[in-house]
Every structure is written in structure tokens, then in C-alpha cells.
């Protein structure tokens, strides 16, 4: 994935944008009135070429993939690249401790799903903690924490499966899959 920060000529109105393009998902996340963090999923080969190319070439490709919804974009931070990998923690609870969201798993940065998963973890844990406290039970008890971990497993599995599938769909150039993906994107765009 490629990351950087850009300035736009049109304010972002605190709105996050994500485009699912044939070359990979592209997200612009608001950090200030006219500034967005960029998270751009590309193949390793594409990412290397974009990192080795000029800033002007990088911006031209970024603008072409994103469009002009925020006007013209300019870089305000260095470009960085890092490999995407899916990492799952073996356990999300231990002795009187819980880890949640992206602290438990490293998901592909697609559709804000790591953030959304973290929010759902917090809501579920808060509800369970309130119930445990109202019943005057130990909120750090091993059986309680295990129950929490079990309650979150299905959502974690589903979310991880979804994000992994989206990345595989966009990084696969098998002709039939690429054609189906491009048709789907064209339909979503209209």
C-alpha cells in the first residue's frame, strides 16, 4: 500500500472517500479542511513503480484514479510504501486484559473495516462490562473474558474474510475475474 498526505483545492467537508478502481482501492481520509491522508492499495509492482517515479507522475496517477471531486491534489508529505499482510492474533484476551480492533488483527485497509471492527468490539465489550458490573461480578474474570472473545469471533472472521476477498479481487488479473470486477465497478459508478 502507498500512503501520503495531500492538499486539495476543494474542502473535503470532513468526508472520507474510497474509490474501488481496477488498479486497487484508494481512500482519502480527512485530516483537516483541505488535507487528506491517502491509503492506496496497489500491487507490489505498481507500488514500486509509483515510488520510483517522479512526484508529478505519482500525482498524475493519483488524480486519474481519484478524479477531481476535491479539485486538484498536491502532496504535502513524503510518499511511503509498505507491504499489505493479514495478521491475526492467536488470542484477544489474556490475564485480565483484552485487545480490540486493529490491535488484535492487522487487516487490509479496505472500506474502513478495521476501524469499524474496532468500534463494534468497543460497543460489545462495553455492554458486557456493564452487565458484568451490574451483577457485581469480576470484570477481569477469565471466564468473562473468554465469553467476550467467543462473542466477537464470528464478526472478526466475517470482516477479515471480506477485506481479504476484496484485496484478492483487486489484485487478481485473471481475465474472467478482472472482467467481472470491472463490470461491477462500472455498474456501481452509475
What are these regions (language model features)?
Residues 9-11, 43-47, 104-106:
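A short, flexible beta-alpha/helix-coil linker loop
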Residues 21-83:
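Conserved FAD/dinucleotide-binding core of flavoprotein oxidoreductases
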Residues 90-110:
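Short FAD-binding loop at a beta-strand-to-alpha-helix junction that anchors the flavin cofactor
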Residues 127-190:
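C-terminal helical "tail/cap" subdomain of flavin- and related membrane-associated enzymes
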Amino acid at each position: 500500500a502507498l500512503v501520503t498526505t495531500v492538499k486539495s483545492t476543494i474542502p473535503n467537508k470532513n468526508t472520507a472517500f474510497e474509490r474501488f478502481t481496477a488498479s486497487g482501492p484508494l481512500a482519502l481520509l480527512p485530516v483537516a479542511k483541505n488535507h487528506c491522508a491517502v491509503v492506496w492499495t496497489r500491487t507490489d509492482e505498481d507500488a514500486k513503480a509509483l515510488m520510483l517515479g517522479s512526484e508529478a507522475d505519482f500525482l498524475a496517477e493519483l488524480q486519474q484514479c481519484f478524479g477531481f471531486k476535491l479539485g486538484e491534489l498536491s502532496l504535502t508529505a513524503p510518499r511511503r510504501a509498505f507491504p499489505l499482510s493479514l495478521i491475526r492474533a492467536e488470542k484477544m484476551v489474556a490475564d485480565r486484559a483484552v485487545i480490540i480492533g486493529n490491535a488484535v488483527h492487522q487487516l487490509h485497509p479496505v472500506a474502513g473495516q478495521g476501524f469499524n471492527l474496532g468500534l463494534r468490539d468497543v460497543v460489545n465489550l462495553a455492554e458486557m462490562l456493564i452487565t458484568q458490573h451490574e451483577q457485581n461480578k469480576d470484570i477481569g474474570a477469565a471466564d468473562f473474558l473468554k465469553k467476550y472473545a467467543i462473542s466477537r469471533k464470528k464478526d472478526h472472521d466475517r470482516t477479515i474474510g471480506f477485506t481479504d476477498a476484496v484485496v484478492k479481487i483487486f489484485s487478481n488479473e485473471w481475465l474472467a475475474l478482472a472482467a467481472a470486477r470491472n463490470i461491477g465497478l462500472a455498474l456501481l459508478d452509475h
